[in-house]
Amino acid sequence: MTHIDWLVQTDPLVAEMVQREVQRQQQHLELIASENFTSPAVMAAQGTVLTNKYAEGLPGKRYYGGCEFVDEVEQLAIDRAKELFGAAHANVQPHSGAQANFAVFLALLNPGDTIMGMDLSHGGHLTHGSPVNVSGKWFNVVHYGVHPETERLDMDQVRDLARQHRPKLIICGYSAYPRVIPFAEFRQIADEVGAYLMADIAHIAGLVASGYHPNPVPLCDVVTTTTHKTLRGPRGGLILTRDEDLGKKLDKAVFPGTQGGPLEHVIAAKAVAFGEALKPEFKAYCGQVIRNAQALAAGLQARQLRLVSGGTDNHLMLIDLRSVNLTGKEADRLMGEIHITTNKNTIPFDPASPFVTSGLRLGTPALTTRGFTEVEFAEVAEIISDRLHAPEDEAIKNRCRERVAALCAQFPLYPHLQFPQPVLA
């Protein structure tokens, strides 16, 4: 019996829910920039007996017996992560990117210390000091942003704020910034004011690993990332550093500082994903992600849709929907009606609330995994533009949905995931 057979036999209700999600992923175009499709091997690793094993501590230094084989798995993940990013030390245990960031804060900061991070509305992340997040409640937060004219990082502002506030930690790396991050310039500023420098590369980790974005590991004191998104692994976190002594502090901040037992089945999946990312095929994939983003951006701009900062250097872009008199909330709904999955997003200096927004964030990693090239993304740009420019036209909506269905059929996803029909009798 396969794992699907076991699920159907034991809990057909859950199986039916999973089946519907499989069908949604297969029949929709995934353009959420933070999402991707893992390989069957990554998914298989997460479904192994490693889920049964407690393994508090680190390889060779556990608090439980019977860890000799999970030690091998975790050490392999560590070694591959170090090789992939050129790091001296890696911790593969964080359950998420947020957990990785919290561990760094515990290792380097005390409550009340000053940190600097990008404003969430300009493309930052909740864990970089947003007032609704614990990082914004425990620390004195100074936010920087983008220049109002270029919509690119305002490094003069970053330097001035750092000199004025003397932060203990400066965070660079973002969730909705479509341009290359100048890590070297951040390093100069951090050195000038005596601050630690942390890069959160959750969105661009795959591009960094494959050489399509500058690597922050040689320049930053610590680097955090998720292991999904452009890295195309399981949902999880990772901490990297070039400093072995700092690495020991970071290890203690993960366990026992912020977590208990690691998820060894997920760590096994991380090891598989890192192994995949070390292969030439992954570099080719990331190059296609970039080319597809350029094609999508060009197609949208050719149809009078304004992009924040005028385009993209990486895998994502932001449409300023004020050019078509729509909100992000409205555009997200319009896309959903034609089976394109996106997310509303604030844009710099957004006049709308975070629950409404004036932007729509798009990314190319997931559809690139399905096999899309510049040709298909040119068509995707047409479909998006047609829908946004004529939101009330039912004929256009139906035609867009038909084109989406044809693209999905042309590039099937997970054809091996076969469920009995129907799951629920």
Curated annotation (Swiss-Prot):
Site described as Plays an important role in substrate specificity, positions? H228
Q: Which amino acid positions bind (6S)-5,6,7,8-tetrahydrofolate, per UniProt?
A: L120, G124, H125, L126, S353, P354, F355
Q: Which pathway features in its UniProt record? A: One-carbon metabolism; tetrahydrofolate interconversion; Amino-acid biosynthesis; glycine biosynthesis; glycine from L-serine: step 1/1
Needed cofactors: pyridoxal 5'-phosphate
Molecular function terms from GO: glycine hydroxymethyltransferase activity; pyridoxal phosphate binding
User: What SUPFAM superfamilies does this protein map onto?
Assistant: PLP-dependent transferases
Taxonomically, which superkingdom? Answer: Bacteria
Q: Name one GO cellular component term.
A: cytosol
Principal subcellular localisation of the protein: cytoplasm
* EC number, UniProt record: 2.1.2.1
- Supply the alphabetized keyword list: Amino-acid biosynthesis, Cytoplasm, One-carbon metabolism, Pyridoxal phosphate, Transferase
Which Pfam families does the record cross-reference, listed alphabetically? SHMT
Please list the reactions this protein catalyses: (6R)-5,10-methylene-5,6,7,8-tetrahydrofolate + glycine + H2O = (6S)-5,6,7,8-tetrahydrofolate + L-serine
GO terms classed as biological process: glycine biosynthetic process from serine; tetrahydrofolate interconversion
Q: Which residues carry this modification: N6-(pyridoxal phosphate)lysine?
A: K229
Into which EC class is this enzyme placed?
transferase
Query: PROSITE patterns in the record, alphabetically?
Result: SHMT
Subcellular location field: Cytoplasm
Show the PANTHER family listed in the entry. Answer: SERINE HYDROXYMETHYLTRANSFERASE, SERINE HYDROXYMETHYLTRANSFERASE 1
Q: What is said about its interaction partners and assembly?
A: Homodimer.
Write out the similarity annotation.
Answer: Belongs to the SHMT family.
What does this protein's UniProt record list under function?
Catalyzes the reversible interconversion of serine and glycine with tetrahydrofolate (THF) serving as the one-carbon carrier. This reaction serves as the major source of one-carbon groups required for the biosynthesis of purines, thymidylate, methionine, and other important biomolecules. Also exhibits THF-independent aldolase activity toward beta-hydroxyamino acids, producing glycine and aldehydes, via a retro-aldol mechanism.
Q: What is this protein called?
A: Serine hydroxymethyltransferase
Taxonomic placement? Bacteria, Bacillati, Cyanobacteriota, Cyanophyceae, Acaryochloridales
